[in-house]
């Protein structure tokens, strides 16, 4: 009887402990979402109300003035389309070059494999420099063209290493069976290896897309035509233009109003620039987890 009572008390303690752990895990999971929630809500709120009372879910305190100001600029849509084209084009080219380079390097019988790997690793530590890269892009006639954003950084050694590790993790018996069936190297690569490499290809695509989407420095250097500017560069210009100027220092009311609009525009641009990545990530989630785990098995 005593043992039964003790077991019941022990079970209750275990159940209570499990509930506490679950609540803790849920809170830790939701914690990273707080900054995102703050930015989204702040983009709809008057900065004066936000500073004085904090985040409010009362519709009376909300405003869409920041989004109206941003979308009233016709360059936003043009920059959004440009960023999509640059990001998709860059990501697709990066994935193709990475897997085409990684697969041969995953084969131990490749002549000069070690020296090629050393050469690639050296480029991770020593870059060509900004000025030589600019001169090369200029000599190739890519200045003020989309190719200046896509081509110079299309080869990423880290992506090649991830893809190589993934190919090394695939069973060698697949290749041996294909050779017995009469398949040549190209058939093995395109009909067997590429379909099996979908997880790592999606991971590399996501990495490249996010990196290019958030980039504005290359466009700032190589692009002078406003019609070719990506979204990040357009938003950067809008933020700079929305800041109070030196001529407003004497006009306190005008400066305060400009500061209020600048804060609204800042939060709105963060939401606009982050939205495509947030929408795209759930569709890549299953490939992302699988590709990362498989790509980390071998080096």
Predicted regions and their residues:
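A hydrophobic, multi-pass inner-membrane permease signature
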Residues: 2-299
């Amino acid at each position: 009887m005593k043992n039964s009572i003790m077991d019941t008390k022990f079970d209750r303690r275990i159940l209570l402990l499990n509930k506490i752990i679950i609540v803790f895990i849920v809170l830790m999971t939701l914690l990273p979402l707080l900054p995102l929630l703050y930015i989204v809500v702040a983009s709809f709120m008057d900065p004066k109300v936000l500073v004085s009372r904090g985040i409010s879910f009362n519709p009376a305190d909300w405003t869409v003035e920041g989004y109206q100001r941003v979308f009233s600029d016709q360059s936003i849509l043009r920059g959004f389309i440009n960023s999509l084209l640059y990001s998709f084009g860059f990501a697709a080219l990066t994935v193709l070059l990475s897997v085409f380079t990684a697969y041969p390097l995953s084969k131990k019988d490749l002549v000069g494999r070690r020296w090629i790997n050393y050469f690639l690793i050296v480029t991770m530590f020593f870059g060509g420099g900004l000025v030589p890269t600019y001169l090369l892009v200029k000599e190739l006639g890519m200045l003020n063209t989309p190719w200046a954003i896509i081509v110079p950084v299309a080869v990423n050694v880290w992506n090649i290493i991830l893809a190589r590790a993934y190919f090394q993790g695939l069973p060698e018996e697949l290749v041996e069976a294909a050779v017995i069936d009469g398949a040549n190297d190209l058939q093995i690569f395109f009909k067997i290896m590429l379909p099996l490499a979908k997880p790592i290809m999606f991971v590399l695509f996501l990495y490249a897309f996010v990196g290019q989407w958030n980039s504005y420095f290359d466009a700032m250097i190589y692009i002078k035509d406003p019609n070719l500017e990506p979204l990040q560069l357009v938003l950067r210009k809008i933020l700079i233009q929305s800041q109070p100027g030196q001529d407003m220092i004497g006009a306190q009311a005008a400066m305060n109003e400009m500061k209020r609009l600048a804060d609204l525009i800042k939060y709105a641009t963060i939401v606009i620039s982050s939205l495509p990545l947030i929408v795209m990530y759930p569709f890549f989630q299953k490939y992302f987890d699988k590709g990362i785990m498989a790509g980390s098995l071998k080096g």
